[in-house]
Amino acid sequence: MDVNPTLLFLKVPAQNAISTTFPYTGDPPYSHGTGTGYTMDTVNRTHQYSEKGKWTTNTETGAPQLNPIDGPLPEDNEPSGYAQTDCVLEAMAFLEESHPGIFENSCLETMEVVQQTRVDRLTQGRQTYDWTLNRNQPAATALANTIEVFRSNGLTANESGRLIDFLKDVMESMDKEEMEITTHFQRKRRVRDNMTKKMVTQRTIGKKKQRVNKRSYLIRALTLNTMTKDAERGKLKRRAIATPGMQIRGFVYFVETLARSICEKLEQSGLPVGGNEKKAKLANVVRKMMTNSQDTELSFTITGDNTKWNENQNPRMFLAMITYITKNQPEWFRNILSIAPIMFSNKMARLGKGYMFESKRMKLRTQIPAEMLASIDLKYFNESTRKKIEKIRPLLIDGTASLSPGMMMGMFNMLSTVLGVSILNLGQKKYTKTTYWWDGLQSSDDFALIVNAPNHEGIQAGVDRFYRTCKLVGINMSKKKSYINRTGTFEFTSFFYRYGFVANFSMELPSFGVSGINESADMSIGVTVIKNNMINNDLGPATAQMALQLFIKDYRYTYRCHRGDTQIQTRRSFELKKLWEQTRSKAGLLVSDGGPNLYNIRNLHIPEVCLKWELMDEDYQGRLCNPLNPFVSHKEIESVNNAVVMPAHGPAKSMEYDAVATTHSWIPKRNRSILNTSQRGILEDEQMYQKCCNLFEKFFPSSSYRRPVGISSMVEAMVSRARIDARIDFESGRIKKEEFSEIMKICSTIEELRRQK
């Protein structure tokens, strides 16, 4: 029988059907090839929005820079970056007036963080631009390389492990006339293989020292590497995102810490909270506006969209904000916070890999690296690319483009939210001094504006005033993409509000299914996702039960572990059938061993091993949870693990799930082919780093681990700890005198070696 799809919706309120219109099933689009074109688009657009600013030349790097601040007053309808400093400062002053002491308190909180943060904070994060190798690396490796180079150039403040001391090194490095760096390179040789007697190419990895003069070093330190943003749904065009180097990261972290502390105290800020907490915060603002718009007032809400938020923001504006927020604070604190925006005013965008050319006729492919774009003949390019390159040429230096105005995506989310909220704050009656007033919500570039007024003219006037006020600080509300409704129906950060938040279930669809980590983790993550959606996203019991059955089916197909008594033939069925027949208590077998599924919506919170433990045969228990089993690489067993789940919107979320280590918690080995590439040196560095950290953790189990106070290196800390522990063990008779003196001897040897080095 054919089902008419409209019948499905007869009983469903319109707002609940919204989620069926979202492009969230199936794989998201990924980008291929280089991001060079997208990056050039960003650079050119940013300059176009600020074109009436003043041009200057950076005295250190020779880069041409455009400064749109306090430029002409912005025009209607056209997005522009001409923020006016005095307007921004005034908005900050009014924000402080409405929230007495907010900046003062946030500064105090941040100061404490600045004093305590360790440099290892910078190892968090994924890909980072590594200026020593001029490409992206995992954050930990990039940091290790930077510290290594600093050390070999006589900068040693960071030995203490405090982030602030590392930043002192960064500042000093910028004053040096030259820096010596170590880079990796590959040599290829043709040699005869002894076994096969064939010629093979042998690659060897070398490290070579290279001197970089002040100008080149500064360009590298100020460079943001660019990539294409992947997996973005609902867009036709891809766009570029930036990853900054280690010199910038620490300074940005402190600025964002300050801004986060301010956002936490602002009721209109959608950051840094998320999920249900965010919904509650938003609902409060809406409730306030609706309660106050008594029968005499109209209340309307704009679901807002800003045109090119990042490209019209300006680091110079952020500098003004920070200067205001930190007034009356100690000089060192003001200095350290003002460095990030200053670095961003002088930033360079790396254009990525360059362009790929292929000649169909001659079957040739060649890469034109970004460095060549400044000099290459443009006749090889098509019309649109030619225009891009012509526009960007005056800005190019060594394959990077000078990009003074604008912020790259995701750098100062918190601080830009503070700016947005400061405009929402001006909507109070005491500031508008008329019959209309407004309030709203801001989360990075997304906003919702609620306007109240006695009549429609008042609403219109309020919206106009908000629009123009935003223009003065470089925020461009898009008239085309924002829409207005009676208060009670709007969308904000993909939350749909209809007299309360409607669950937008389609957002969670991508996270259902089998993750592909291993049998144990996948089972646990799968049921946790269903459980979480019952709690947070209106997933009803019947649908949840169905989701569970689909998940189990999916899981069995993925791991080819159909029930032992099934007819389905796979390459595992022979073994699983044998196990099924040998097992007395078949209910005790895990699903991944061909057992039955005992999950239902009431017991999703229990890990499968625990759920079935009492039902298992004894020898099965022994095999399943045996620490000596050679097939299991047992990490220390944490009771809770973190999985990365992909919601449809926003970054990958980290989700906790219960982890019980069994023979099914295997960890796949690293691909061998990496060992023959130029990445090898990096891999070795990374393993070295890992080993050091593991060793350190052996000396300082987490229970006794306090933040190291005072200045000592990891080695010194471990040696002194070893001495203390040895003495205690010797005095309590746990170790013999010979062992004690041997430990003491080893400690002295280590210290001696350190002194010689």
From Swiss-Prot:
GO terms for cellular component: host cell cytoplasm; host cell nucleus. A motif (Nuclear localization signal) lies at residues 187-195, 203-216. It comes from the Viruses. Keywords: Eukaryotic host gene expression shutoff by virus, Eukaryotic host transcription shutoff by virus, Host cytoplasm, Host gene expression shutoff by virus, Host nucleus, Host-virus interaction, Inhibition of host RNA polymerase II by virus, Nucleotide-binding, Nucleotidyltransferase, Phosphoprotein, RNA-directed RNA polymerase, Transferase, Viral RNA replication, Viral transcription. The keyword Amino-acid biosynthesis does not apply. It catalyses: RNA(n) + a ribonucleoside 5'-triphosphate = RNA(n+1) + diphosphate. It is found in: Host nucleus; Host cytoplasm. Its EC number is 2.7.7.48. This is RNA-directed RNA polymerase catalytic subunit. The lineage of its organism: Viruses, Riboviria, Orthornavirae, Negarnaviricota, Polyploviricotina. The gene is PB1.
